[in-house]
């Protein structure tokens, strides 16, 4: 039934981790196989893989590129692959037409210069080279191994020393247009005076051509600025989306922190404030001490409410038993036995606070009530009130006719008196009470007192000696094998001793004897969580809540007597199952939705 126990403890920490689901983005290439589109696809994918899936997919970028039929400018988010790559010529064929027009215009100007320069071959070559220099800014080179300007100048000088003037002109034509300014200087040094005057007119024509190129360059800069603004806007929106996702993850982390705090609070189960003055005041009423009666109890005028309550307790109907006991107390506030059974039933119904108040009131009315003293010691232990638990167990010895002489004999011992008079909780106080119980057990010899063994088991539980506590409870069970409360205490000790598998067996035995034992059902769910059987844990918690509600509905009780820590444990189990929609139902207290989800009868 609890097949998940092998990985239980190891999986609890892993279940609390916040996982982010990532999705691989498919890479697509342009159908036209343009270099620009291919490069843009690669760059966007590289950028996409560097952060979570929070930005638009690569398809969005490709669609925009195809629709605009232009290339995206190189921005800070885009890597430059080569220094000689001009993206504009790859996507705008219009610029080639403009270049040809400017080339023809420059050629016509060059021909006019030839007529004015007496047909000199050198001037013709120089004018043609200047026309190439004008076309240089509008032309891109895909060559990655371009010579530097200084190397080209050295090449020109080297060939000039060894070859004729005609060979010099041919070599200069093979150089890149990027050396235009230096070539103009070289021409001016080797020309005659008429050639220089002709060169001035050529420079004037070059200035005019540059002015004609300013407008297209500014238009291109404006378009690039617009593209850059669009990309910056996109990046800004992506940053906002990332911040929203980050906030969602942080809220998810807060959820797990809240679950951890709730788990620790449930483990402490320390909801009772220590009020020593209220404990010593016998004349204080029950309502003033914190017990809250059901305001609309349908049995408040029921004749023989106490006897009817005992009958319902044997049947295992704990919520209705509580109502009958409250009715009996309202009819007779001094009925100590009714307070006793009310406290014991509240503890079995997983309401420790009300149990402690009722048992305290019982002992105020009847200080020698041994059952109330033992039940109060167990409730104090469950709420981590060790000093109060030790005092209750000591009072059990003092009020017991069989063992009270042990306390009188120990009064002559200064060491015991000093240890028992200390108010702070320390090991000496616990050891002093434990010595009393061990001596009482030794006095009994082979005879086993189940109540004494129960008290000894509680003391060993308080000191963390779980194996010895288990032995004490097992000894008590040899005398009372049908005592479901003893089976439950044995299961709790086994669970605290890291023996959850055996604890499940003890709880199961307690529920076989008393199916309506809600505390044992709750403890069984906690052991299932420790074993990693989260679904079984949820089933047990829902069964306990359903039992509480069923009794309330049958008797038409308007105010539910449902334990809050059962709901807290249920939320923890649902969170470990990774069921957010069911966890939300638990937060809303929607028991019907949860029962249907786990196929349980309402």
Swiss-Prot record:
Gene name, per UniProt, is Pex5l
- Bilayer topology term: Peripheral membrane protein
> Which segments carry the region annotation Disordered?
94-140, 167-206
GO BP, one annotated term:
regulation of membrane potential
Its taxonomic path starts at: Eukaryota, Metazoa, Chordata, Craniata, Vertebrata
Its quaternary structure? Forms an obligate 4:4 complex with HCN2. Interacts with RAB8B. Interacts with HCN3. Interacts with HCN4 with a 4:4 HCN4:PEX5L stoichiometry; reduces the effects of cAMP on the voltage-dependence and rate of activation of HCN4.
Q: Which UniProt keywords apply?
A: Cytoplasm, Membrane, Phosphoprotein, Repeat, TPR repeat
InterPro entries from the entry? PEX5/PEX5L, TPR-like_helical_dom_sf, TPR_rpt
- Job of this protein: Accessory subunit of hyperpolarization-activated cyclic nucleotide-gated (HCN) channels, regulating their cell-surface expression and cyclic nucleotide dependence.
The cross-references to PANTHER family, in alphabetical order and at most eight, read: PEROXISOMAL TARGETING SIGNAL 1 RECEPTOR PEX5, PEX5-RELATED PROTEIN
Annotated Pfam families: TPR_16, TPR_8
Membrane spanning residue stretches: none
Q: Tell me where on the tree of life, at the top rank, the source sits.
A: Eukaryota
GO molecular function list: intracellularly cyclic nucleotide-activated monoatomic cation channel activity; peroxisome matrix targeting signal-1 binding; peroxisome targeting sequence binding; small GTPase binding
What GO CC annotations are associated with the protein? cell tip; cytoplasm; cytosol; dendrite; intracellular cyclic nucleotide activated cation channel complex; perinuclear region of cytoplasm; peroxisomal membrane; receptor complex
SMART domains, per this entry? TPR
Expression by tissue, per the entry, reads: Brain specific.
Where's it found, cell-wise? Cytoplasm; Membrane
Placement of TPR repeats on the sequence: 302-335, 336-369, 371-403, 450-483, 485-517, 519-551
Q: What is this protein called?
A: PEX5-related protein
Family membership noted in the UniProt record:
Belongs to the peroxisomal targeting signal receptor family.
Q: Which residues carry this modification: Phosphoserine?
A: 181, 229, 233, 237, 421, 423
């Amino acid at each position: 039934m609890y097949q998940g126990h092998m990985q239980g403890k190891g999986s609890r920490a892993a279940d609390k981790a916040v996982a982010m689901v990532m999705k691989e983005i498919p890479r697509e290439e342009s159908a036209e196989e343009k270099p620009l589109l291919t490069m843009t696809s690669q760059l966007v994918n590289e950028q996409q893989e560097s952060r979570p899936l929070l930005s638009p997919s690569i398809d969005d970028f490709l669609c925009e590129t195809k629709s605009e039929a232009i290339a995206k400018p190189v921005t800070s988010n885009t890597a430059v692959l080569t220094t000689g790559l001009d993206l504009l010529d790859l996507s705008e064929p219009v610029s080639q037409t403009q270049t040809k027009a400017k080339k023809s215009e420059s050629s016509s100007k060059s021909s006019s210069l030839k007529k004015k320069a007496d047909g000199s071959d050198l001037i013709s070559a120089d004018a043609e080279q200047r026309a190439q220099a004008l076309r240089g800014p509008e032309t891109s080179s895909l060559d990655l191994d371009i010579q530097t300007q200084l190397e080209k100048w050295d090449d020109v000088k080297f060939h000039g020393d060894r070859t004729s003037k005609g060979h010099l002109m041919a070599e200069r034509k093979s150089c890149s247009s990027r050396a235009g300014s230096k070539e103009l200087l070289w021409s001016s040094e080797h020309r005659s005076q008429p050639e220089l005057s002709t060169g001035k007119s050529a420079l004037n024509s070059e200035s005019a051509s540059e002015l004609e190129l300013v407008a297209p360059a500014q238009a291109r800069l404006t378009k690039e600025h617009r593209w850059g603004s669009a990309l910056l806007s996109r990046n800004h929106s992506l940053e906002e989306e990332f911040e929203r996702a980050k906030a969602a993850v942080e809220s998810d982390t807060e959820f797990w922190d809240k679950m951890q705090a709730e788990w620790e609070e449930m483990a402490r189960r320390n909801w009772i404030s220590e009020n020593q003055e209220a404990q010593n005041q016998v004349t204080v009423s029950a309502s003033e001490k914190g017990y809250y009666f059901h305001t609309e109890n349908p049995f408040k005028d029921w004749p023989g409410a106490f006897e009817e309550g005992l009958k319902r307790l044997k049947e295992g109907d704990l919520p209705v038993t509580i109502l009958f006991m409250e009715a009996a107390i309202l009819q007779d506030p001094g009925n100590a036995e009714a307070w006793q059974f009310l406290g014991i039933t509240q503890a079995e119904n997983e309401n420790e606070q009300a149990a402690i108040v009722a048992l305290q009131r019982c002992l105020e009315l009847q200080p020698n009530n041994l059952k109330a003293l033992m039940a109060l010691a167990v409730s104090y232990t469950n709420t981590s009130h060790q000093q109060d638990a030790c005092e209750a167990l000591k009072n059990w010895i003092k009020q017991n006719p069989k063992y009270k002489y042990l306390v009188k004999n120990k009064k002559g011992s200064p060491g015991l008196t000093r240890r028992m008079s200390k108010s702070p909780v320390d090991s000496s106080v616990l050891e002093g009470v434990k010595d009393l119980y061990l001596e009482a057990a030794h006095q009994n010899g082979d005879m086993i007192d189940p109540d004494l063994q129960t008290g000894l088991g509680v003391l060993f539980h308080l000191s963390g000696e779980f194996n010895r506590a288990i032995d004490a409870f097992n000894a008590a069970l040899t005398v009372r094998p049908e005592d479901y409360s003893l089976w439950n205490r044995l299961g709790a000790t086994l669970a605290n001793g890291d023996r959850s598998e055996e604890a499940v067996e003890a709880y199961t035995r307690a529920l076989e004897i008393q199916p309506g034992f809600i505390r044992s059902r709750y403890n069984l769910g906690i052991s299932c969580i420790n074993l990693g059987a989260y679904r079984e844990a949820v089933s047990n918690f829902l069964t306990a809540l359903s039992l509480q509600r069923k009794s309330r509905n049958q008797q038409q009780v308007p105010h539910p007597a449902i334990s809050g820590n059962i709901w807290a444990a249920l939320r923890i189990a649902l969170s470990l199952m990774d069921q957010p929609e069911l966890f939300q139902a638990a937060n809303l207290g929607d028991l019907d939705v949860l029962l249907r989800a786990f196929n349980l009868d309402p």
